[in-house]
Amino acid sequence: MRIGNVTLENNVILAPMAGVTDLPFRLLCKEQGAGLLCMEMVSAKAIYYNNKNTEALMEIDERERPVSLQLFGSDADIMSEMAKRIEEKPFAILDINMGCPVPKVAGNGEGSALMKNPELVREIVSKVVKAIEKPVTVKIRKGF
């Protein structure tokens, strides 16, 4: 299976799950045969403000590659700028979160709330894809 220029060993993909897909869990899933591991979502604004906890969430172990980093936010300019800022990190794919229904995310117009604004979705995806060379995917939620 291929996603852009990234070839996966198989089509078993670990979904990004906040509070679950930390490094030990990802390594366990890799040992069990996952072809792509997805990290917990990170906030574009937290990257912008150099949040130390967010830096820790973006740590990648060589044994887990390939890995996808999931970014969330609702400002297309900040999303694209932060995607570019972190592009040198060793993740293979950037995933945009448009599926998280948690009130503190969706309540800010981020995550699944973006599905209510197709024009903003288009702008975010377009700007992020243009900003980086790595493949970009989008996690969505069916309905809202």
Residue ranges of each PLM-predicted region?
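Flavin-dependent oxidoreductase catalytic cores
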Residues: 1-144
